[in-house]
Amino acid sequence: MAMTEESVDQVEVNCLCVQHGQSCNNTRCFVKEGLRANWFYNPVLEEFAIPDSYQEGHGVNVKITFSHRSRNTGQIPLCLSNGTCHISEKGLHFSANFSKDGLYIAIINETNYHAAEHYYLVYIYENCHQMPYDSPRHTGHNGTSFNWSMGLWLVKCSHNKTFFLPFVLDSAKSAPIIMTETAITIYISMIFLIVSLLTFLNVLITLNNKYKHYGV
């Protein structure tokens, strides 16, 4: 993202190399002072491309603050007053105050909940409506230092708005697989039960017809 007049209070961090097509040309991003650099990831995000219009010219001022919620709500990070934030598998809630409407890029790096590292790319721009992005939202990456996926959300937001983004980690992602396996087991059991009942009814009908034939 390019530095603009609106972003003079930001510090440059060598934190992002978004792959543009087959090559990586953008190796800079800007974060507001006070954000911890370890929220951002330096090496190339392989096998991922974003449109040209998202590449440059959007380094406007953005202030991101994190809020703490009970883990029981299912939306929880554990955020500390010193600016560090540990994301749980349930999600991340934060508010953003923008100096002007525009596009913002943020990568959040969670390394404390699981041994593996997880990276999330978030696009934020005007009018405050969450939108799906036509790129895969969960894409596995091989040969990189993280072994699960990258979640991508488009959020339209004007300045001084608060919004929620539902981040999902690998432990939560495994739940649908478990549910699918359970569903398959249930379906097979139901089919077996139905077949057994039909067989039993067929035996009863056969015996009944036989008894009628012999006048029992």
UniProtKB/Swiss-Prot annotation:
Keywords: Early protein, Glycoprotein. Signal peptide: none annotated. Glycans are attached at residues 25, 82, 97, 109, 142, 147, 160. This is Early E3 25 kDa glycoprotein. It comes from Canine adenovirus serotype 1 (strain CLL). The lineage of its organism: Viruses, Varidnaviria, Bamfordvirae, Preplasmiviricota, Tectiliviricetes.
